[in-house]
Amino acid sequence: MGGLLNVTFGNATELIVALIALKEGLLGVVKSSLAGSIIGNLLLVMGLSMFLGGLRYKSQTFQPVVARMNASSMNLAVIALLLPTAMNLTSSGIGVELSRHLSTAVAVVLIGVYGMTLLFSMKTHTYLFDAATASKEGAVAEGAVAKGAVEAVGAIAPGNAKSHNEELKEDPKEKPKEHGNHISPWVGVLLAATIAVAFESEFLVMSLEAATEQLGLNKLFTGVILLPVIGNAAEHATAVGMALKNKMDLSVSIAVGSSLQIALVVAPVLVLAGWVLGQPMDLNFQPFELVAIAVSVFITNSISSDGESNWLEGLLLLAAYAVLALSFFFHP
């Protein structure tokens, strides 16, 4: 729940900035910032978390089952973003309206999928996302294996088997202490901060083009690299902080969960908002942006599939982000 709240309010800022940019007709900036947020969370945030956490704890673990489910969801997001662009590139005579209709239909599907993932993680299969429960189940499974071995020895030395068997029994009276959840005040603080950001976002959007020209940067680099890093700095710091506290499950849920929410919620909502604001917003991204997203998803899935991380894996993610950032910087 903590990771979901952090991701939701963090992406609320992203959504507000994107809505203001969309209202001003800056469609290229909106799409670039969406692509950059996905790339930044998967490579920069997760890379920093694994690298700094790995330097302190040598090796850290998180739930591989959740990592694989997140990987499948990200693969779906890549497919959903790729197909409208692929159709536009491979078919002739496709107008803006047809592209918008396809993007709207895809947006509805993605929002529905995200709703189902919330139902899966918070209702029907909560035990898979509870780190404490998962660890306990792993210990029980190991205990069952050890118990079988002890019983085999017990056929030869019953006395010894009994003493070891008793050690494997779990005291039913031992229950984890429950602490009251006082999250309501903090939700209010996050909500107030989000509202404050809404007022400041308009000034950011208005000064974006002028600042880009003064710094001599191309719009693609600004939208994909600079804007997401600045807009999600607090969320990035939280994920890294959790890794430094050896809470890698929460760190991964913030990094990957944020990317999923952007791909499955924020982007579709912006497509639907385009109809209301009278802007031709669709999911037809630049091919180079899609290649960068696909590369980010591929390397992140490869590294996180085993549910274990170290500083070298974090360094690999950071190196991939640096290569992509340089590519966007020199992109004409």
Predicted regions located by residue number:
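Alpha-helical transmembrane bundles of multi-pass secondary active transporters
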Residues: 28, 42-206, 281, 285, ...
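Hydrophobic, well-ordered secondary-structure elements that form the walls
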Residues: 212, 260, 321
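Generic hydrophobic-segment detector
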Residues: 4, 8, 26, 30-31, ...
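Helix-loop-helix junctions within the multi-pass membrane cores of secondary transporters/permeases
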Residues: 2-54, 222-279, 295
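Long, well-ordered mid-to-C-terminal structural blocks that present hydrophobic/aromatic surfaces
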Residues: 193-234, 238
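A long, glycine-enriched binding/interface module in the latter
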Residues: 273-274, 285-287
